[in-house]
Amino acid sequence: MRYIENHMEAALWRQGYRDGIERLIEERYKQARVERSAQWTDFPTGIDEKRAFAKEILGWPLTEGRGGVPEVKKELLAEEENFSLYRTTVEALPGMPFYGLLFLQKGTPVRPLILSLHGKEGTPELCSSLLGSSTNYNEMTQRLLKTGAHVYAPQTLLWNTDMFGVPYNRERVDARLKHLGGSVVALEAHCLMRSIDALSGLDCVDAENIGVCGLSYGGFYSLLLAALDPWVRSTVACARFTDLDFDIGRIVNEGDAQISWK
């Protein structure tokens, strides 16, 4: 072949392709905003259909239902004046243990349950002040305990590996799950919901009064659980309440790119 050109000769065409992709995405965002706004016009009519649609967007394992009530395995860590502290595991899926800290109040047998959800780089031990300081969590779990409710602080795939060990790659996990029709957000939402199923079965828990409180990424999961789980009656989302019109670039690049938004 005799025709030769400079390696930048087709840059204008490449730029056109790139810019076209960006325009397409922006147009889809505009359409999605209109669709989201329309979904609120008849709220709460059709809430079950909307909840099923949200699960379908997120993918497996939310699309397969919840099944029976899983067993809670408890290991006693401490007996404090007002509560007993356990490290617990729930088999959220076959062969997959999901762990957390469970603070059971002493005294009156039946009480509400509040989930205390840590954020990015956190652990239940950190947000619950077991490490001596709760840093930016401002004693979150301990403050929830002062309400008189039982508190459950679970671990999601977000801990700081330099501080807490056990390396992982959340983005790779999410990519592999998407190959299977799911997402890491769907998996962890399912784990949290299965934990609620398990803990609701305890004699001391009032299954009609379950709430969620989370900081940062935990706040994101708090909002998600409020949408997905009819057992969640109240939610506090700290530093994560967004309608997606606020700093969309940061949202996509730093946090919730694992989730499909529509």
Where are these regions (language model features)?
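Alpha/beta-hydrolase fold nucleophile elbow
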Residues: 204-216
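Alpha/beta-hydrolase-fold catalytic nucleophile elbow
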Residues: 155, 213, 238-239
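Cap/lid segment of the alpha/beta-hydrolase catalytic domain
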Residues: 109-110, 114-196, 201, 246-250
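N-terminal targeting or regulatory segments adjacent to alpha/beta-hydrolase or S9 domains
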Residues: 1-84
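Mobile cap/lid helix-loop segments that gate and shape the active-site cleft of serine hydrolases
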Residues: 178-179, 187, 232-262
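Glycine-rich active-site/cofactor-binding loop and its immediate structural neighborhood
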Residues: 74-132
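Alpha-helix C-terminal capping segments
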Residues: 227-231
